[in-house]
Regions:
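Alpha-helical transmembrane segments of multi-pass membrane transporters/permeases
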Residues: 99, 153-181, 195, 202, ...
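Small-residue-rich hydrophobic transmembrane alpha-helices
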Residues: 48-108, 145-157, 164, 272-335, ...
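Residue-level signature of the transmembrane alpha-helical core
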Residues: 23, 27, 60, 64, ...
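Transmembrane helical elements of multi-pass membrane transporters/channels
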Residues: 17-37, 137, 148, 201-208, ...
Length: 459
């Protein structure tokens, strides 16, 4: 028993060392987004709607970057574990190139079709005008955004989580300063309104991408650019990244019919859902996603070292730590939900609904504590299909299916929605546990590593 306790303490120290910079990075990203929303809300309702609609399309390059980032962290952590520096450098080189190439079409689409894309969603003329301008600028930054995400994840795979935090922090501070100054026209800056918010995003993403590329090109960090000539790496990057992209898009697309379902119960119920979700994300996302990233790093590196049994033990220990932390967060969020909601709305009906939604989400924090380390372990091994299946099952069968049947068909109203939300996240855990227990994720990772090793030896 004492040995188990010491083992958990040892892995907990490693998790904290790797995880706190990731948590800070996530907090800064959330803060940047919150500032954008607050500044935009000072313009007009049309501006808020314009940014909201444009962000629906901006999810696509974001998901591409996150997908390639998952591929990068899996391969770079595995190659770090086996000491294959050249192969690891080829991973980041090819991931950055693929990311930049994937982002270029969005620049063209933004220049030509930005207004049409906003109009396609049925927006009014002023919303189309503002949303088109904002989307054009955001899409212009797509290659840079993707490169920044890939660069951060690649470095994290080596075990360096502080440098991405610093670079991302610099970019976010620049973004926030420009958003406030150019958006509101304070200090000596011109008042550009919504264009200023877009320019802040563009400049911030540009700085982030240039800092990562400059770091890799200088060879001063753990990663550097190598001649991109490995077809095996390209194939593995795409095979790992693809399901993660689909995972993110399935969740984003499911939000459209789910919001339509919520609107049946009134604007207040819909607004309350978004308030509860925003509070939940602000409080839990930095922590849960940190556990996912850290588990990916440890899993990939340990598999690269050729210690598959140690991987399973580490995952179990991180699972216990994550579940304990998020359970405590769940309890805290449940207790303080009412005062938190009061910061977002003064309407009594909206506040009443929002408190309930926040408490429902707080219960889901327990599922997040279980799911994210399991998903991180699978992703670190290169298995992104199982987390994709988990999310797809959750959003289609539970988030949409269960919610609709219980709330509309059986007439339970919002109670059916609450059950649908909780069951969604429980289903994620169910599928992830099956994947960890019965899937061949360790064997598949060893096969991927072996193929990269053979290719290196043949050259």
């Amino acid at each position: 028993m004492k040995k188990i306790s010491e083992d958990i303490k040892q892995i907990a120290r490693r998790v904290f060392k790797l995880g706190w910079p990731v948590t800070i990075q996530q907090v800064l990203n959330t803060l940047m987004r919150t500032v954008d929303v607050v500044v935009t809300s000072l313009f007009s309702p049309a501006a808020v709607a314009a940014v909201g609609l444009a962000d629906l399309y901006a999810q696509i390059p974001l998901r591409i970057g996150l997908g390639l980032g998952i591929g990068s962290i899996a391969l770079s952590s595995q190659d770090t574990g086996r000491g294959a520096v050249t192969a690891r450098d080829r991973v980041v080189t090819q991931a950055v190139l693929i990311g930049a190439l994937c982002g270029i079409p969005f620049v063209v689409i933004g220049l030509v079709f930005s207004n049409a894309l906003i109009q396609l969603l049925g927006a009014e003329s002023e919303v189309v005008r503002l949303g088109g301008l904002y989307l054009m600028i955001v899409f212009a930054a797509a290659p840079l955004r993707i490169v920044g995400l890939v660069g951060a994840r690649s470095l994290q795979g080596t075990g360096d989580t502080r440098t991405p935090m610093i670079i991302n922090g610099i970019a976010n501070v620049i973004n926030i300063v420009l958003t406030v100054s150019l958006g509101l026209g304070i200090w000596l800056a011109p008042n550009l309104g919504i264009v200023g918010v877009g320019v802040g995003t563009f400049v911030g993403r540009t700085v982030e991408a240039l800092l990562f590329v400059g770091l890799f090109a200088s060879s001063r960090g753990p990663l550097s650019f190598q001649q991109p000539r490995s077809f095996v790496i390209t194939k593995q990057l795409l095979s790992v990244s693809g399901p993660n992209f689909l995972e993110g898009m399935s969740t984003s697309l499911a939000n459209f019919p789910f919001n339509a379902l919520l609107l049946i119960f009134g604007t207040e119920a819909n607004a309350a859902y978004h308030i509860g979700r925003r509070i939940f994300q602000q409080v839990t996302s930095p922590i849960s996603r940190s556990f996912a990233v850290v588990t990916s790093i440890i899993t990939g590196q340990t598999l690269g070292e050729g210690r598959p049994e140690a991987v399973r033990q580490d995952v179990r220990k991180i699972f216990i730590i994550s579940l304990s932390v998020l359970s405590a967060v769940s309890l805290l969020l449940f207790v303080i939900s009412s005062p938190l909601v009061s910061l977002f709305s003064e309407d009594p009906t909206t506040r009443e609904y929002a408190v309930t939604f926040t408490r429902v989400f707080s219960l889901s924090a327990i599922s997040f504590g279980a799911f994210f380390p399991l998903a991180g372990a699978l992703q670190g091994a290169g298995d992104t299909r199982t987390p994709f299946y988990a999310r797809l099952l959750g959003v289609t069968v539970c988030m949409l299916g269960v919610s609709y049947v219980l709330s509309i068909t059986l007439g339970f109203g919002l109670t059916g929605i609450y059950i649908g939300i909780i069951s969604t996240h429980v289903s994620w855990v169910f599928v992830a546990v099956l994947g960890i227990k019965y899937g061949n994720w360790v064997g598949n990772a060893e096969a991927m590593i072996s193929k990269r090793k053979q290719e290196s030896e043949n050259k």
